């Protein structure tokens, strides 16, 4: 949790848990304080004239006298928690990752069930995704229909990606498997030259399509989409699929209306086989929401961060309160 002014506070993930042994010292101090109070009470009872004692003793509630000491012990406990080094989950922008944006440009993308058409909506949402993706991520772009073409190799230059998105052209047929294999090759190539760690950079494929694979017709073919998805899983590259459109989509081909309903099932299967997630969108607003969700997943990583500062600040405040109450109640600091 995070408290205003104090910052993140956690009671888990302690890096120096042996500091909790200091609690025994705090308990020892508390026991010593109790013993001192008992001894003090006994000394007071030695006065023969109790009426005289009551007349000269400060007229303050006895129970309030112990508040400063209690606050002091509480401050020591808070300092103990801080020294034990609690941690919490912190989301930070990735500065070493590869994302391949793979977009279907087959003729079915002419369908106007999504205004103004599927392609134009895809371009607008993809450009927004590219613009909002964290700067350190290398983003590449592949367009595919009957063949797959790397339009932009993975780069942090978002202008190149947006410019290429504006120039997408329609083409015949749909080779989803080839597009995935092409993306994997691009990821492997850039992963070999990106430094910053012993392991290859984390990678993700974002596959955008609206229809079934037509080359080959069997997705389990050696060059099919399912085979490519299994290969992606073996290489540790999950595929996030976005199926875009409605079941009412159609295009005009040679003067005839050809239905092009969105194919959610194939995309879900590709995501499942690769270890990724599947999404579907039927409007531009839904598509932008999907991309926003992906941006949060892809653009950030969760690490363990220090959460001791909040406990330290709280301990200082309680310690200051102990000193203040000691001066107000007992007219001296607690002993």
UniProtKB/Swiss-Prot annotation:
Protein localization: Cell membrane
UniProt entry tagged with the keyword Transcription regulation: no
Location, primary (coarse class): membrane
Membrane topology qualifier: Multi-pass membrane protein
Domain VWFA as annotated: residue spans: 98-294
Positions of transmembrane segments: 18-38, 67-87, 133-153, 309-329
Keywords: Cell membrane, Membrane, Transmembrane, Transmembrane helix
Pfam families: VWA_2
A single Gene Ontology CC term: plasma membrane
Family membership noted in the UniProt record: Belongs to the UPF0353 family.
HAMAP family registered for this protein in UniProt: UPF0353
Protein's name in the database: UPF0353 protein ML1808
Source organism of this protein record: Mycobacterium leprae (strain TN)
């Amino acid at each position: 949790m995070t408290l205003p002014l104090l910052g993140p506070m956690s009671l888990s993930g302690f890096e120096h848990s042996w500091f909790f042994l200091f609690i025994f010292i705090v308990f020892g101090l508390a026991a010593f304080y109790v013993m001192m109070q008992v001894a003090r009470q006994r000394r007071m009872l030695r006065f023969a004239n109790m009426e005289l004692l009551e007349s000269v003793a400060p007229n303050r509630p006895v129970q309030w006298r112990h508040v400063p000491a209690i606050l002091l012990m509480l401050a020591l406990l808070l300092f103990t928690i801080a020294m034990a080094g609690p941690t919490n989950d912190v989301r930070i922008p990735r500065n070493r990752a590869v994302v391949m944006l793979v977009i279907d440009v087959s003729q079915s993308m002419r369908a106007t069930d999504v205004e103004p058409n599927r392609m134009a909506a895809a371009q607008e949402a993809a450009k927004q995704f590219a613009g909002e993706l964290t700067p350190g991520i290398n983003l590449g772009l592949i367009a595919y229909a009957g063949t797959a073409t790397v339009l932009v190799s993975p780069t942090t230059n978002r202008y190149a990606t947006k410019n290429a998105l504006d120039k997408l052209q329609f083409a015949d047929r749909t080779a989803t498997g080839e597009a995935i294999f092409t993306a994997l090759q691009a990821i492997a190539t850039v992963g070999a030259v990106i430094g910053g760690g012993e392991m290859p950079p984390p990678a993700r494929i974002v596959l955008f399509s609206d229809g079934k694979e037509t080359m080959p017709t069997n997705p389990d073919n050696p060059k099919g989409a399912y085979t490519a998805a299994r290969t992606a899983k073996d290489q540790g590259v999950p595929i996030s699929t976005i199926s875009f459109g409605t079941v009412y989509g159609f295009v005009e081909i040679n003067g005839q209306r050809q239905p092009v309903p969105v194919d959610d099932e194939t995309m879900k299967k590709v995501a499942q086989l690769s270890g990724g997630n599947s999404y579907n969108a039927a409007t531009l607003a839904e598509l932008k929401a999907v991309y926003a969700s992906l941006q949060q997943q892809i653009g950030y990583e969760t690490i363990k961060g220090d959460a001791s500062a909040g406990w330290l600040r709280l301990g200082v405040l309680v310690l200051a309160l102990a000193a203040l109450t000691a001066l107000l109640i007992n007219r001296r600091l607690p002993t």
